């Protein structure tokens, strides 16, 4: 704490806020060896050098001795840190087998250690340390008579276990053994001699805690990756988020702090430096490391590692500073384009001192600082602000005050708090002007930071909570650069996205709550997002939300600008789309005071396939699909005799032909109507068919699965074969199947038969599964399709037929079964023309083989669609099915299929979207995009088995399916099940 002479002749104490060094880990010196090698030099001298650093900070120890004493609750409250490290890292889970969700593009664990084994090691080491600590405590509690032999033995075991796991990594990095390169220097630092159990008596409980933390941090230096620290999960931050948002590369941060003297990595980010001296104590580097620490495989990771830093040191050679130096620093930083200023300094005894008003009211300061956000540490006296602050709102900039929480999420015992103090506007406390309304908290205890000597250390204080907020702002202003000109809106984003802590709402202890970095980079309220349609003249078309909500029969009559929540909240966990929409986006906009910010949302999030699995029923829908396949299978297999009757293979149960005077047979068939999940089951529960057969002419009329009747390929006579998502036989017929159908066949001679037919599907979606469809008239609430089919069937020899056909599919507001929650995307629909070649063969021994392959080309109907087919889409599908009756027993049936469901091989889609066209200003306009589509080929294999049991009164069926889709999030799935039906 420094006494200085400040403005107006008053004595002011201005300090960097309680940068308490808990311990420091060394930088590994590089030395030349023969043969040349990069190794790690001696550790002990670096520890010795740090003794002076401890000495310099002695005045602060008295303030936080209680904090050290309270470290035991730290271990107790986050026991997962040691007991189960995966729980400590939480959702980020950097030690899982799949590192991408946390690390993103960073290369982690490239030194031979695997991520899962590192996690397993710390799981065991945590439990071992608990045992050491328990024995140590018992011995110390006994006083002079305490026996430390058991604790010493357990500690030796911990060291041996660490040597077994980490020895090779230490050897590779230091050129020394585990003992010489790591363990011995650290044990010596704490005065521990494992051959002398009495040496353990010298360490207090807090010293033991510090030893194990340093043991942990030291070993993690050898992982070959950046350090992961507790604060990352707490503030909901991952390196991947930083990568997505741009690393902070287009943001300039102002650092008003001590000089960064020895950290050459951080110095690379400092593009300009000023100040009254080069005085340093490591505080500036520690603060900066949390903002811009490089993601380089070692040390501290910052939230915005590529941000530029303008630095100013207001402290003179004596380590003191006054308001005049602070004012000069602010002007220098803001004049050099710093849009967020981190100030981890303040006046002891207050959360926000009145002196700040004088600084910001100065004309020179206010003119330069008006477009910057100032992030100020709250201070470390553990006081609650009681005095109001007279505040000049006309001149003073946007401000965020940051307090500290501990590792259990409670306010730090040293952190100052806002209380009920207010920023007074002409002696009046107005709504939103309380200090607590501008107060946020972030982790500030035991923070891993740069020691400014090339290594890392742990420090505590509000000084280290503030840079987390500054780093989050740097990400914001990198992703949305124009926010640098909107400091109030930027401040609002940080404060409004905070996670509530303490008493509900804004409170005198935690203010608005806990910093949430991910939430700040996300929409504050999805319900307020909007997107723009492009009108027929190619112009953005916007309409007030109140006009969009006007409805007729519960559905809007217009949709130009719409709430994106109706899209996003649908949250489908699976969408069976026939084309890859990767790289295609639409843009939603969030109103923010005088500006907006945009969000690129994958186009696929507003596209709906024909087999939808919703977020609130994903597992139930899967089970329903599985059960449905069982039911169809049992009902669809041909078997002779028995008290239970298997249906014909196409699902229809045929009655005996009805004789008539015309010489033609008439057959009426019925079958259960299969469900289309995600759609309403209107009308009768059964499908039906009337078949009229003459000498050369066969006519069929019906309601239901017309695809089987029209395709007429032997061995491919199950409706599931024509499912565009699951089967591979003529999917164009499958997309139009389910409603009325008709087919006419004429025998040209004994071998050749020609046919013509039509089928249609007209179904409404079940909006109880898709709540978004209750609010907007999208065109996707109803799927309508029809198909015309022309075929020729040639008998190559008895029992072997070759079938060729042409199919034209018309879809309204859809593309190959895919629809959109934006009515304009597929406004006038599409037409698809397909050619199919099939072979049906009776192989004898009650065995049938069916093969079908389809190639198709799709074009759009008319113009004005938001998603345009600019180059016809080419798609394919195929299936091969082998069916054996009497597989094991006389009347059982087995069926093996191999298929490639419908998918788009090639083509070009075009979109017109309204998006930001100038990222420096946020200006929006219409952008036309061309996307080449295509995806990895999906493949599927399926095995079905059914037989009658219990003297043919009951039946058993088994089902198994494997799907391989290299382009999907889940590249391989396996499904299996069985069913027993018992008859009485």
Describe the function of each predicted region.
Residues 253, 257-260, 391-474, 478:
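Extracellular S/T/G-rich loop segment that most often corresponds to the catalytic His/Ser-adjacent loop
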Residues 143, 154, 161, 165-192, ...:
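Substrate-binding/access-modulating region of protease and related hydrolase catalytic domains
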Residues 290, 312-315, 443-510:
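Hydrolase catalytic cores
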Residues 37-40, 44-48, 118, 126-127, ...:
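Protease zymogen maturation seam
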Residues 239-253, 258-323, 336, 395-398, ...:
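Subtilisin-like serine protease catalytic core
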Residues 150-157, 196, 201, 205, ...:
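C-terminal subdomain of the subtilisin-like protease fold in secreted/lumenal serine endopeptidases
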Residues 592-838, 968:
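Outer membrane beta-barrel translocator domains of Type V secretion systems
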Residues 727-731, 755, 769-782, 793, ...:
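Outer membrane beta-barrel transmembrane domains
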């Amino acid at each position: 704490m420094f006494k200085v002479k400040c403005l107006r002749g008053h004595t002011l104490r201005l300090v960097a806020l309680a940068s308490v060094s808990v311990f420091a880990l060394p930088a590994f010196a590089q030395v030349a060896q023969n043969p040349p090698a990069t190794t790690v030099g001696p550790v002990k001298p670096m520890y010795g050098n740090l003794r002076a650093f401890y000495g310099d900070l002695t005045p602060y120890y008295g303030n936080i001795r209680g904090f050290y004493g309270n470290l035991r609750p730290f271990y107790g409250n986050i026991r997962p840190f040691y007991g189960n490290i995966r729980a400590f890292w939480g959702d980020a889970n950097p030690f899982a087998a799949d590192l991408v969700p946390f690390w993103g593009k960073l290369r982690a664990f490239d030194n031979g250690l695997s991520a899962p084994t590192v996690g397993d090691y710390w799981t065991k080491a945590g439990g071992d340390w608990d045992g050491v600590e328990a024995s140590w405590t018992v011995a110390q509690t006994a006083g002079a008579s305490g026996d430390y032999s058991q604790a010493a033995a357990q500690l030796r075991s911990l060291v041996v276990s660490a040597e077994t796991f980490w020895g090779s990594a230490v050897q590779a990095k230091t050129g020394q053994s585990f003992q010489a390169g790591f363990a011995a220097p650290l044990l010596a630092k704490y005065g521990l001699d494992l051959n002398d159990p009495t040496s353990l008596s010298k360490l207090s409980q807090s010293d033991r805690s510090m030893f194990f933390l340093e043991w942990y941090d030291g070993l993690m230096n050898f992982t070959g990756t950046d350090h992961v620290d507790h604060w990352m999960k707490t503030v909901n931050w991952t390196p991947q988020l930083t990568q997505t948002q741009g690393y902070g590369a287009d943001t300039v941060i102002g650092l008003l702090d001590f000089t960064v003297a020895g950290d050459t990595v951080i110095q690379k980010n400092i593009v300009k430096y000023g100040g009254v001296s080069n005085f340093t104590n490591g505080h500036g580097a520690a603060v900066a490391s949390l903002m811009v620490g490089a993601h380089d495989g070692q040390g501290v990771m910052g939230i915005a590692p590529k941000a530029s830093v303008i630095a100013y040191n207001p402290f003179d050679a004596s380590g003191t500073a006054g308001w005049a130096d602070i004012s000069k620093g602010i002007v220098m930083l803001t004049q050099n384009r710093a849009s967020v200023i981190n100030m981890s300094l303040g006046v002891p005894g207050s959360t926000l001192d009145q002196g700040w008003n004088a600084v910001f009211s100065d004309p020179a300061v206010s003119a330069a600082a008006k477009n910057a956000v100032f992030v100020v540490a709250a201070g470390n006296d553990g006081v609650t602000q009681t005095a109001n602050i007279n505040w000049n709102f006309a001149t003073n900039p946007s401000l965020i005050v940051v307090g500290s929480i501990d590792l259990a999420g409670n306010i730090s015992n040293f952190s100052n708090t806002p209380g009920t103090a207010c920023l007074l506007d002409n002696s009046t406390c107005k709504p939103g002007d309380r200090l607590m309304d501008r107060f946020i908290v972030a982790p500030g205890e035991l923070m891993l930071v740069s020691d400014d000597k090339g290594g890392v250390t742990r420090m505590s204080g509000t000084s280290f909570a503030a840079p987390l907020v500054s780093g989050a702002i740097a990400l914001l202003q990198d992703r949305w650069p124009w926010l640098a000109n909107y400091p109030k809106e930027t401040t609002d984003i940080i404060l409004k996205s905070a996670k509530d802590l303490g008493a509900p709402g804004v409170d005198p202890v935690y203010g608005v709550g806990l910093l949430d970095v991910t939430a700040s980079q996300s929409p504050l309220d999805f319900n307020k997002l909007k997107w723009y349609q492009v009108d027929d003249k190619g112009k953005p078309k916007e309409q007030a939300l109140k006009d969009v909500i006007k409805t007729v029969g519960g559905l809007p009559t217009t949709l130009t600008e719409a709430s994106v929540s109706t899209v996003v909240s649908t949250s489908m966990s699976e969408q069976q789309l026939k084309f890859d929409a990767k790289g295609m986006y639409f843009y939603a906009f969030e109103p923010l005071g005088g500006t907006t910010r945009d969000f690129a949302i994958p186009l696929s999030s507003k596209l709906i396939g024909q087999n939808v699995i919703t977020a609130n029923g994903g597992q139930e829908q899967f089970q329903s699909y599985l059960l449905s396949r069982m039911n169809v299978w049992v009902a669809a297999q041909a078997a002779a005799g028995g008290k239970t009757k298997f249906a014909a293979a196409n699902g229809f149960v045929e009655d005996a032909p009805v004789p008539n005077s015309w010489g033609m047979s008439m057959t009426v068939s019925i079958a259960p109507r299969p469900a289309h999940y995600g759609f309403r089951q209107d009308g009768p529960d059964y499908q039906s068919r009337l078949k009229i057969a003459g000498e050369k002419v066969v006519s069929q009329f019906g309601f239901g699965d017309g695809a089987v009747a029209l395709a007429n390929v032997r061995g491919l006579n199950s409706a599931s074969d024509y499912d565009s998502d699951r089967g591979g036989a003529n999917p164009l017929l499958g997309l139009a199947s389910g409603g009325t159908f008709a087919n006419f066949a004429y025998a040209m001679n004994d071998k050749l038969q020609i046919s013509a037919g039509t089928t249609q599907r007209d179904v409404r979606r079940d909006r109880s599964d898709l709540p978004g469809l209750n609010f907007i008239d999208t065109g996707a609430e109803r799927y309508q399709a029809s198909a015309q089919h022309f075929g020729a069937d040639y008998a190559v020899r008895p029992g072997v037929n070759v079938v060729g056909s042409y199919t034209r599919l018309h879809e309204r507001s859809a593309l190959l079964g895919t629809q959109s929650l934006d009515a304009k995307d597929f406004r006038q629909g599409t037409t698809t023309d397909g050619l199919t070649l099939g072979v049906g063969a009776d192989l004898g021994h009650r065995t049938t083989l069916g093969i079908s392959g389809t190639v198709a080309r799709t074009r759009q109907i008319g113009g004005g669609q938001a998603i345009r087919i600019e180059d016809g889409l080419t798609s394919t599908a195929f299936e091969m099915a082998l069916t054996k009756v009497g597989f094991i027993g006389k009347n059982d049936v087995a069926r093996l299929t191999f298929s490639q469901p419908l998918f788009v091989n090639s083509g070009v889609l075009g979109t017109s979207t309204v998006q930001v066209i100038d990222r420096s200003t946020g200006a929006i306009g219409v952008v036309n995009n061309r996307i080449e589509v295509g995806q990895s080929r999906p493949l599927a294999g399926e095995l079905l088995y059914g037989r009658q049991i219990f003297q043919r009164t009951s039946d058993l069926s088994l089902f198994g399916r494997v799907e391989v889709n290299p382009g999907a999030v889940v590249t391989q799935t396996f499904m299996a099940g069985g069913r027993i039906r018992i008859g009485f």
